[in-house]
């Protein structure tokens, strides 16, 4: 008899909205403090400069407001946990949108406009609204969870590329970590390996003997930021093991063939 389908993780809509808003505010304040030399640095993401990466983050908020301004879609086609696997096909569109956004106004003005537009749009709509999106139609509630991934991942990118110290909102970091952990479990269903990302997530994955009691024989443990970098291709499995940022025990405790989940 096949195992019962796991119920998707539930997120508190109010906390997610607050986390997205707070993280965008952290980035806006951090970007305002970057100097010309920092903005001209390579971002580490293809050919983007730090300025283009910053413009992309402004676009994240701007595009959310634009999506809510469009007529709603009929039914959702994509859930939050499926979203990471659908992102690769949009890289070209997103890169072009970042360049167009940066050409539109200075960064401080972009952030002020995008933040205000996002706030107005979120105030006017409930999480049940279905957005008509490039990637596939999603409920606003699910799409906002994916915004925590975009914002946390790119805040980390900005910090590393520009030498900044923009804070990560705890609730945004938690939601990002959990969504990417659940995506791993969706990609490799099973119960032979336990992946621990304290204090936010524990999932089981990979086909094989399911552990039911005591200490699991196959365990992977890491911290949230290392997990996010692994899941998004910012670092690789071997390097994380060598640097002791990942602890893996058991013959099945190897996630290298499953990572990254998105890039």
Annotate each predicted stretch with a short phrase.
Residues 2-51:
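An N-terminal domain-cap segment
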Residues 2-15, 63-116:
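Short, helix-capping/interhelical loops that line the mouth of catalytic, cofactor-
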Residues 2-6, 70, 85, 89, ...:
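C-terminal interaction segments
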Residues 16-23, 107-114, 144-147, 173, ...:
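Amphipathic alpha-helix face/heptad-repeat signature
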Residues 41-80, 130-179:
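Short, contiguous alpha-helical
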Residues 94-147:
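Internal, conserved structured core segments that host functional sites
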Residues 171-199:
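A glycine-rich beta-turn/hairpin centered on an aromatic-Pro dipeptide
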Residues 189-226:
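Glycine/small-residue-rich hydrophobic helix-like segments
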């Amino acid at each position: 008899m096949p195992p019962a389908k796991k119920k998707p993780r539930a997120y508190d809509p109010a906390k997610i909205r607050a986390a997205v808003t707070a993280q965008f505010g952290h980035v806006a304040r951090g970007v305002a403090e970057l100097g010309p030399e920092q903005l001209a640095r390579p971002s580490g993401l293809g050919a983007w400069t730090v300025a283009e990466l910053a413009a992309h983050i402004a676009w994240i908020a701007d595009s959310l407001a634009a999506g809510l301004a469009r007529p709603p879609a009929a039914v959702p086609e994509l859930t939050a946990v499926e979203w990471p696997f659908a992102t690769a096909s949009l890289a070209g569109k997103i890169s072009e949108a970042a360049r167009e956004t940066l050409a539109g106004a200075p960064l401080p003005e972009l952030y002020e406009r995008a933040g205000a537009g996002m706030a107005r749009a979120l105030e006017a709509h409930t999480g049940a609204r279905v957005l008509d999106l490039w990637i596939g139609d999603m409920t606003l509630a699910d799409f906002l969870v994916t915004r925590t991934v975009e914002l946390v991942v790119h805040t980390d990118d900005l910090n590393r590329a520009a030498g900044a110290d923009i804070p990560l909102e705890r609730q945004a970091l938690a939601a990002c970590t959990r969504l990417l952990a659940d995506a791993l479990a969706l990609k490799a269903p099973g119960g032979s390996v336990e992946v621990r990302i304290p204090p936010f997530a524990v999932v089981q994955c990979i086909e094989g003997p399911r552990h039911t009691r005591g200490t699991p024989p196959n365990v992977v443990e890491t911290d949230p930021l290392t997990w996010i970098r692994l899941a998004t291709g910012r670092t690789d499995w071997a390097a994380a093991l060598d640097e002791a940022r990942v602890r893996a025990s058991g013959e099945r405790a190897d996630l290298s063939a499953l990572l990254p989940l998105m890039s």
